[in-house]
Amino acid sequence: KLMHDLLAEDGSMYVHCDWRVSGYMRLVLDDIFGTNNFQNQISWYYRRWNIASSQFARSHDDIFYYAKDKGKHIFNNLYIPKSAKSSGNGKSWVSVIGDDGVRRSVLTEEVSKGSPMPDAWEISVINPVGLERLDYPTQKPEELISRIIKASTNENDLVADFFCGSGTTLAVAEKLNRKWIGSDLGKFGIHTTR
C-alpha cells in the first residue's frame, strides 16, 4: 500500500512472482490498485535445461502490471522488429490484403516499427557464466528490466525498486537516463547493489 501511495499519478508498478504466489499476489494488487487499474499479466518465458519429472517443466514467471491511474499512466508502445525483406534503398515489404481479399506484398516508403509487443516475453535467464551474473539468487536479466522501464517511463523520470536485490533495475535505469532510488531489507542485497 505504501508503494502505491508513493507512486506518481502517471506511475505504474510491475510485480514479478512465480507460480507459488501469483494467484494470491493478483488478489492483493487488485485490492490495493483496484481491478480497473490492472493493465497486463505478462508471462516471462525463459529457456533452461529441464529435468524429466511428474509434471510439466516450469518455463515462465508472471509479471503483474498496474497503473496508479489508468487514464494518466505512461505507456510507450514497444515493438518487435519485423523480419520482413528490405530493399536496398531502405524501403520495406509489407503484407496487405487487397479489396479482392487476396494477400499481396507491397513496397512501402515507411520504415516499419515492427509488431506491437505482446504480453508473452521470451527473454533468457542470465547465463551462469555470463558477465551480467552477480550470483544473487533472484537477479533478473537486464533485457527484461530494460523492456519494463522503456514501456512505462521517459528519460529523467524516477524509477524506484523497493526490493532491489542485485541492483539490476538501478543499473538499467542509469543506462536509460532515468533517475532511480532503491532499497532492500537484506544486507546481502544492499552490498550486492553497491
Residue locations for each model-derived region?
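Core catalytic lobe of class I
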Residues: 1-192
